[in-house]
Amino acid sequence: MELSYQALRVASQNREAEELRTEARRKNLLILIMHYLLQEGYMDSANSLEQETKISLRRFDVCDNVDLETILMEYESYYYIKFQKYPKITKKALDHDSRVQSKPRSAGKLRRAGSNSTQGLPRIAQQTVLHRPVSGSYFRTHAHQKALSRENSKQENGGNSPREASEIGLNVSAISKTSGEGGQTRRRQVIDFRSMIQDTIKGASQEIALNSLNCNPDPSERLIKPVGAFIGGNSEMRELAAVISRDIYLQNPNVRWDDIIGLDAAKRLVKEAVVYPIRYPQLFTGILSPWKGLLLYGPPGTGKTLLAKAVATECNTTFFNISASTIVSKWRGDSEKLVRVLFELARYHAPSTIFLDELESVMSQRGTGPGGEHEGSRRMKTELLVQMDGLARSDDLVFVLAASNLPWELDYAMLRRLEKRILVDLPSKEARQAMIQHWLPPVSNSSGVELRTDLDYSTLGAETDGYSGSDIRLVCKEAAMRPVRKIFDALENHHSEHKNLPVISLDTVTTSDFLEVLAHTKPSAKSLAEKYAAWQKEFESV
């Protein structure tokens, strides 16, 4: 089993390294195109390219002596040396109607098989199949086999065979034994798979750690597939897809898993649904297929949205931050179309995560509103339920993460489709103590002014019972403001413009100061704790 675990890890790390290579290759190609357009004066085309890729390509520049024209010239020279003729780069296009009907090429996919109308490359040998080399040893083995075959053909023909042209202008000589001795040696050889796997793990991990491809996983620099390859020539779908694409989260929230204090069960389930299926797809098949829906419910300010920000930062997925204003339209029929386009775009950009915040505003119980429910709202809810059913029956890596402060108002059909329902409760005493220590450390100098504290964290953790994480942050901020307010009078009375400001020295924040702030800052959702616990007993799914 140990060997199998190592093999899974190797496959995961190699897949991550290959994804980094592909991402870097696509980004480098777009930067080369942008550089060429700007160099040739195609300013409007360069601006359109920058808007469609959703990243600022002008922040990057090509290296010295590298441009698109030089790369094309070098390829033509290489092709001529290898095949004694220049490559055919372009061909006459089809008529306009046929070209519109043809499907655009999927972005990010490398297609090696050419069309039948394109002139193929000359065949080197009828029985030889060329593959992309993966290491330097391939060149030595392949060159040695070709040298042996040429030597045997010369001996059979009496040395009168015509001289073959060198592929790249290099003469390669064999350094190993004859083929017969080599075959006997290979039959006696014992292959140490364990050492091979360990070497592969070490090389892959070093490659990823060194980040030699300059591929930063920052969401703001991630390439987004062009919408044109998804919608084709339908103008209505293009407009709806553009509306949804604006909610693809490209900023970096800079929230890590370790930054979230507590919420261990929620973090574990999110990793099971988003992170692990991408890293170890061999494990998530059949009955072990990943979760498609997760509901985070609990009092406001307990970290539900913060957990979604961690997903956007840590998980290498396309993150759709959807609100009610995105998928609700005043025009008849547009709401359900927006929902359908949302899920189709999520499949197109897979792996992806759809985050629905304040879910009760979109999926409240049907037929319970005063005066009956509007027809458009009912159709939109039905379409959302149908699309989530389609996710459950497919193998697409699309995950729905929903958050709600009022789970008892959600439609029961939506609860069934959200397979996991996690209560994000008020923090425990240990979590509250860690939060206070995080926001008010003994010494902090982040704003340029040194602030010192002398707090009994254990006592304050017990005194803040019923406070949410957001409430505790508010209390810490108010406690830190108390010594700052004392120096406002001195700063306002300093009228001389030529004299320097006096040295600012803030008083130490003590435990008594913190307790005084607690007396005037009450928790926001303490009264709802029992209601959440009662709903959890009836609908919990962990």
Curated annotation (Swiss-Prot):
PANTHER family: AAA DOMAIN-CONTAINING, KATANIN P60 ATPASE-CONTAINING SUBUNIT A-LIKE 2. It comes from the Eukaryota. GO terms for biological process: microtubule severing. It is found in: Cytoplasm, Cytoskeleton; Cytoplasm; Cytoplasm, Cytoskeleton, Spindle; Cytoplasm, Cytoskeleton, Spindle pole. Gene3D superfamilies: 1.10.8.60, P-loop containing nucleotide triphosphate hydrolases. Keywords: ATP-binding, Cytoplasm, Cytoskeleton, Isomerase, Microtubule, Nucleotide-binding. It catalyses: n ATP + n H2O + a microtubule = n ADP + n phosphate + (n+1) alpha/beta tubulin heterodimers. Belongs to the AAA ATPase family. Katanin p60 subunit A1 subfamily. A-like 2 sub-subfamily. The keyword Kinase does not apply. ATP binds at residues 298-305. One of its GO terms (molecular function) is microtubule severing ATPase activity. Its main location: cytoplasm. This is Katanin p60 ATPase-containing subunit A-like 2. It is an enzyme of class 5 (isomerase). Pfam families: AAA, AAA_lid_3, LisH. Residues 94-126, 142-168 are annotated as: Disordered.
